[in-house]
Amino acid sequence: MDNTIIIPYSDVESKKEWLWKYRMPHKNVAFLYGSSEDAVEALIAEIIACVSMGRALAVDNMSRQAGRVIYQNFKDGQIGAVKASLERQKADCSNIAYVNFNHKKAMECIQELEKAIAEFQPSLVVLRNISQCMEKQKDLYDPLKMAPILHR
């Protein structure tokens, strides 16, 4: 063979950081979908509770420090229901916040969210029912448009 060198991947150091090992990358965009709103809400609440308390996530023994979370539900009237879900999971609600947009337009909401992320420095940002405030739903599914906001 010429100068070809074969290196097995077992010899390569992984550079991926995980929020939830092998399921949810750290500082990346992840989408959770499900046919049951209750099941999706329960999973989100469990993930947020683990991050807020510094607990390991299911099937993941990674130790972590407690982190902050912005949990933004864009559906009107959900704040009380969200808090109840978080309390059921024994989340540390002092590490979890939402941004009060006061009926602002989509672009203003994005700007407010950017400011909140910069100020609060969350380990995790959860955007629920975001399609209700997006002018173009396709933007929601374009990681190139959403990721710069979440990577700050």
Task: Go through each PLM region and give its residues.
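N-terminal pre-Walker A segment at the start of P-loop NTPase domains
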Residues: 1-19
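N-terminal start-of-chain detector that recognizes signal peptides
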Residues: 2-5, 41-45, 70-73, 98
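Short, acidic/glycine-rich phosphate-metal binding loop used to engage nucleotide
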Residues: 10, 36-38, 103-105
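Conserved inter-motif catalytic segment of the P-loop NTP-binding fold
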Residues: 19, 62-148
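Glycine-rich P-loop/Walker A and Walker A-like loops and their local beta1-loop-alpha1 context
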Residues: 26-59
